[in-house]
Amino acid sequence: MKRTKSIHHASFRKSWGARHLTPVALAVTAVFMLAGCEKSDETVSLYQNADDCSAANPGKSAECTTAYNNALKEAERTAPKYATREDCVAEFGEGQCQQAPAQAGMAPENQAQAQQSSGSFWMPLMAGYMMGRLMGGGAGFAQQPLFSSKNPASPAYGKYTDAAGKNYGAAQPGRTMTVPKTAMAPKPATTTTVTRGGFGESVAKQSTMQRSAAGTSTRSMGG
């Protein structure tokens, strides 16, 4: 009987210990989860063109050219599209717009609308691009086109923004920054035209959301 009681006591001690270790295990798990979140960021470089990239990465001229050309193709597919040149210029400034290829993501009915009014539709010039190492061996680079406005009245004035309107700071090539990996993910193709000022509104909303998120993060870290 004494032996049986001893076994029961050991079982109770084991159960008690397991229960009281659980918070520690949870804390360790949380640390690993936070470490995983930190690894979700990626360091990217911002360039205006392939020459800028090549100058900053000696021996990588071919990769820089490929990334630049891929960014141009991505810009054609995802950049905001306008039915008229005037709408595009009002947002991005004189000399910052070009006719977009008819196949660049637009639905046939929207192509017809744009062509009826101006013979084509319009998009901003690619002002630069983000470039970062691809995961999985680093065999190549991921890239994301960036746009910028020369119109002081636009929320995108003097800023690098992506096709979704997210702001990446001053339009100064040669910078390196850390961005979420989602920033380098392909954006959906633009299938409709944007009204005048519509892209600027998107930039303003994105900037407000970014500031709000940054403030929340700061408060959380500060307790």
Swiss-Prot record:
Residues 204-223 have a biased composition (Polar residues). Residues 178-195 have a biased composition (Low complexity). It comes from the Bacteria. Residues 178-223 are annotated as: Disordered. InterPro entries: Biofilm_formation_YgiB. NCBIfam families: PRK11653.1. Belongs to the UPF0441 family. HAMAP family: UPF0441. This is UPF0441 protein YgiB. It comes from Salmonella heidelberg (strain SL476).
